[in-house]
Amino acid sequence: MIAKVRELLRQRLSPLAFQDVCFYLWNCRFYLPRLIASAFVQRTPIVQGFPHGHIAGPFLHQLRGVNVFAPTKMCRVMTRHGSDKGRGIHNYTAIYSALFGTLHDQPLLILELGLGTNNMNLTSNMGAEGKPGASLRGWRDLFPRALVYGADIDRGILFEEDRIKTFYCDQLDSLAIRNLWSQPDLQSGMDIIIDDGLHTFDANTSFLDGSLEHLRPGGVYIIEDIHQNTIERWHNQLETIYSKQFPNHDFALLEVPNSSNQSDNNLLIIRSGA
């Protein structure tokens, strides 16, 4: 029934009006009920720090205390632009709000890999209704002094807007990653790096290997949508390689509870030492 109503509205409304109606319905069905319920329901992520037994103090404590059931302003902003970071299947925005909430007025440099291609022929696409650049526009709105950069393998969706610039990158190609980081705009390093590209272990580690050195002191590197069946592989990689290779960084693997998604609603969050 809901699908039929959506299709009828899509046919009769302009794209912008249809987007506004969908956002209003989302607020009524998801945001407001969850906002009320979050006063009574507390759901926190399972957080594993690396190396095993390492206590990273306030960083891990902060992550373990986030109520991922509670919607936030970031949830609304990202959803308004068409991002899936906080609209049901993923609920990362509560965690990001806790991590970045005090940085609202800072002149941040942010890079997100994966613009959200709607090219159905490419792996990890967002479907025909996907909105490329949705998350980038969300970051721009949330941080009014930030410069936001994006990268994607789909050259057809690259774009440039006010405080947003995007580049080509194939995250399985080490040369392409080096070429990305050779761009003049990216020479100062990043305060926040998000990998929301090709969601495979090999792709994630490939981009991480070529990008972590470009994270500024105190910066945060995030890998989204880690699949549940790769958690143990990540445990081993973090314990035996990355935590030793980067001893001044804090590593936290988060399994984020979500009744709508029990397969890939997991994050790796890395904080660079000062």
Regions found by a protein language model. Give the residues of each.
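A short alpha-helical cap/connector motif
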Residues: 1-194, 198-222, 227-274
